[in-house]
């Protein structure tokens, strides 16, 4: 199955970390392509309108554009070499350099949709224009609005091959596993931890409702245990089919996670995982959606965070 990875890059250390991470972690399959996507800072419209009236200003703008273009080509060229150095065939790498049109995050999302990319990879910092710094980072906005494309946010390069995958018993969690398996393939040395937060009525309603309905609380947890047993059977079958040994996969359950994002953050930091993976949707309406994904990308519990669409 053909896979396309869009790596949004700039001249910053976080972009270099993102490129190296994508090259070393993802499976360099023969049908996987990597696009290095560089968005150049736009020349303010007022300068473009007024400069032609002043030859000296027009010459300065032309020099500024040449300098910008040359810097972008140099940056992307270095990052392409980094991909090749870490095992990606040069024939699998595409380069796209373009001026900003609507804004950094919007342009990345539009390119991902137009190119039908499976995954967006970007650094947690470094791509946000100065004028947008108080609006929110590019990574945060991409995660918030990439409803159909998975996003990998990389804070720093890591050699850790420990991956924490937050799961519930939903079909979407199986889709998350499929994304992990397709991205990593049968590469050796990885450890996968399937992390489940036991459901509470307070995940749906108030704490008072939970206290006042002990039978419902027991019912929801008993049912969850049975459903997770079925989920794990299917999960192990999919790992095995992909060539991932049973010894590489662990199960962890948080029985007292009244706040789901906090439970994930605590486990991620306690276990010092290199990568944390969550799904955008789950059984509980708020389980891995908006609020939780946004909190995790702001806190960055690991070197890399995946939000799987």
Language model segments and positions:
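Structural beta-alpha unit
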Residues: 1, 44, 66, 78-120, ...
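Gly/Ser-rich helix-loop-strand patches that form or flank binding pockets
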Residues: 3-4, 21-28, 107-159, 266-309
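A conditional alpha-helix N-cap/helix-loop micro-motif detector
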Residues: 15, 101-102, 173, 257-258, ...
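A short acidic, glycine-rich active-site loop
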Residues: 57-74, 214-230
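Small/aliphatic-rich secondary-structure junction motif
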Residues: 1-62, 161-218, 237-250, 299, ...
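Short, solvent-exposed amphipathic alpha-helices that sit
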Residues: 21, 71-79, 107, 226-235, ...
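Membrane-embedded alpha-helical bundles that form conduits across membranes
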Residues: 57-58, 185, 213, 260-263, ...
């Amino acid at each position: 199955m053909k896979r396309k990875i869009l790596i949004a890059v700039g001249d910053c250390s976080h972009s270099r970390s993102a490129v190296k991470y994508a090259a070393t972690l993802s499976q360099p399959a023969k049908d996987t392509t990597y696009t290095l996507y560089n968005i150049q800072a736009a020349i303010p419209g007022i300068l473009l309108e007024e400069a032609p009236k002043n030859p000296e200003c027009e010459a300065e703008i032309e020099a500024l554009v040449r300098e910008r273009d040359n810097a972008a080509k140099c940056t992307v060229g270095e990052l392409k070499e980094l991909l090749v150095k870490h095992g990606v065939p040069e024939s699998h790498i595409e380069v796209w350099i373009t001026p900003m049109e609507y804004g950094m995050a919007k342009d990345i999302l539009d390119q991902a949709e137009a190119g039908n990319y499976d995954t967006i990879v970007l650094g947690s910092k470094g791509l946000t224009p100065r004028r947008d710094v108080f609006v929110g980072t590019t990574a945060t906005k991409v995660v918030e609005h990439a409803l159909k494309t998975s996003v990998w946010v990389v804070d720093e390069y890591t050699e850790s091959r420990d991956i924490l995958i937050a799961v519930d018993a939903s079909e979407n969690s199986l889709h998350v596993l499929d994304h992990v398996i397709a991205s990593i393939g049968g590469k050796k040395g990885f450890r996968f931890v399937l992390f489940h937060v036991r459901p509470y009525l307070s995940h749906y309603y108030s704490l008072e409702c939970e206290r006042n309905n002990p039978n419902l609380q027991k019912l929801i947890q008993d049912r969850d245990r049975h459903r997770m047993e079925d989920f794990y059977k299917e999960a192990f079958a999919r790992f095995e089919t992909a060539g991932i040994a049973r010894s590489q996969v662990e199960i962890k359950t948080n029985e007292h996670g009244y706040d789901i994002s906090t439970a994930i953050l605590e486990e991620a930091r306690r276990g010092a995982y290199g990568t944390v993976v969550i799904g955008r949707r789950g059984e509980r309406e708020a389980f891995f959606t908006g609020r939780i994904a946004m909190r995790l990308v702001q806190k960055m519990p690991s070197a890399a965070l995946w939000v799987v669409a």
